[in-house]
């Protein structure tokens, strides 16, 4: 469950280390984002020679949440922290590698690239 001002780890190799959610996209009064939702983020901490700089604003897709996601069979998939993957304006991943597991809920046509780059799909 991600809302405005939530800080997330970055699960790709763009050079960003942590980001802050500045808007949950999809609806004028939408408050929360879950796994697979697109959010607007600001870079809060970045590596010196990365692709992105501190203060830049990007789209991102949420790939892991501490709240987790409920499956139709009743099981719950949860993670230790919140993580996102940075996207460009065409909603394609900026990085070329994904770190850590992602959930099966990302297997939509929009995010198949992220699923194929991920080392583990839960």
UniProtKB/Swiss-Prot annotation:
Keywords: Ribonucleoprotein, Ribosomal protein, RNA-binding, rRNA-binding. GO terms for biological process: translation. GO terms for molecular function: large ribosomal subunit rRNA binding; structural constituent of ribosome. CDD domains: Ribosomal_uL14 (cd00337). One of its GO terms (cellular component) is cytosolic large ribosomal subunit. Pfam families: Ribosomal_L14 (PF00238). SMART domains: Ribosomal_L14. It comes from the Bacteria. InterPro entries: Ribosomal_uL14, Ribosomal_uL14_bac-type, Ribosomal_uL14_CS, Ribosomal_uL14_sf. Belongs to the universal ribosomal protein uL14 family. Binds to 23S rRNA. Forms part of two intersubunit bridges in the 70S ribosome. NCBIfam families: rplN_bact. HAMAP family: Ribosomal_uL14. Part of the 50S ribosomal subunit. Forms a cluster with proteins L3 and L19. In the 70S ribosome, L14 and L19 interact and together make contacts with the 16S rRNA in bridges B5 and B8. This is Large ribosomal subunit protein uL14. It comes from Dechloromonas aromatica (strain RCB).
């Amino acid at each position: 469950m991600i809302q405005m001002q939530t800080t997330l780890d970055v699960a790709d190799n763009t050079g960003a280390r942590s980001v802050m959610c500045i808007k949950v996209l999809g609806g004028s009064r939408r408050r929360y984002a879950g796994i697979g939702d697109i959010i607007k983020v600001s870079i809060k901490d970045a590596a010196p020679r990365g692709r992105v700089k501190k203060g830049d604003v990007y789209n991102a897709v949420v790939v892991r949440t501490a709240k987790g996601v409920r499956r139709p069979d009743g099981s719950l998939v949860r993670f230790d922290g919140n993580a996102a993957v940075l996207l460009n304006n065409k909603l394609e991943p900026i990085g070329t590698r994904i770190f850590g597991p992602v959930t099966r809920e990302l297997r939509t046509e929009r995010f198949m690239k992220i699923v194929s780059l991920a080392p583990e799909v839960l």
